[in-house]
């Protein structure tokens, strides 16, 4: 039985981690940390946990974590783990980081997109960015992919890796539920401004753009850039990504469909659907559902991918990475059915 700590327990992703591990047969959450409410029971803040846990919130203590736990999860906003995780890196202690602090390998690019960082390059390079359905977690510092990046990369991987599309033609239209913005209050997330509405935000400036570009470049060195837009939709959770690209010469739709089937045939959490997927099909699960369509008039392939931003886009994939790192079946504790 592995013991783990969660830093950022009062956030959406932190609480989702706790929910997953409650059902994980090989893990016990023994330490939970937040920036306030020390000594108070978690169930005092989340009444739905009454009778399920007696854990109390503690002030962050890296020495305590390394002495009493086998791994630590950072379910924190950008800028936190780059300060608090350095001791763990120095001691080669297992960390799964759900934030964007260690996802980019280039310090100059990191500073451009995340701003105001004092992170040193040697620390930035210490982590392994691991898209769990494509790679294998091996390093003791795992940078968990972002929600938009996860849905986009899983949609594009077979195409980019196998050179099936014109790389200069990639357009991605990504939509997120409100929990993707975290718990911070703003006009953009105010109920009155969100309900019965849809709005675009961070056009051409979302921090997941360089993360996506970095990985696509690894898969195909000829990749240069993509057009990526993000919108908020009035649902509590979920990511709905529509990706478009021109099909390269010598490839037909059947060949492309077969490529997706072959790439993901052995993957536990990627499902290639015969029809276009619905967002509700994946809510509460670690699945990514993908649907394909081809327009022969324009020679454009449409790829729709849907995930739960708090599961596959955050906590679910983090546990999948943890399972890989510690030698468990990667699906252990993650076989949730979609909620109705």
UniProtKB/Swiss-Prot annotation:
The EC number(s) this enzyme carries: 1.2.1.38
GO cellular component annotations of the record: cytoplasm
Question: Which residues of this protein are catalytic?
Answer: 147
> What are the recorded Gene Ontology BP terms?
L-arginine biosynthetic process
Which pathway does it operate in? Amino-acid biosynthesis; L-arginine biosynthesis; N(2)-acetyl-L-ornithine from L-glutamate: step 3/4
Q: Which domain of life is it from?
A: Bacteria
Primary localisation category: cytoplasm
Q: Which subcellular locations apply to this protein?
A: Cytoplasm
Query: Entry's InterPro entries?
Result: AGPR_AS, AGPR_type-1, NAD(P)-bd_dom_sf, NAGSA_dehydrogenase, Semialdehyde_DH_NAD-bd
Q: Which GO terms describe its molecular function?
A: N-acetyl-gamma-glutamyl-phosphate reductase activity; NAD binding; NADP+ binding
The UniProt similarity line reads: Belongs to the NAGSA dehydrogenase family. Type 1 subfamily.
Name the chain's protein.
N-acetyl-gamma-glutamyl-phosphate reductase
Q: Which gene encodes it?
A: argC
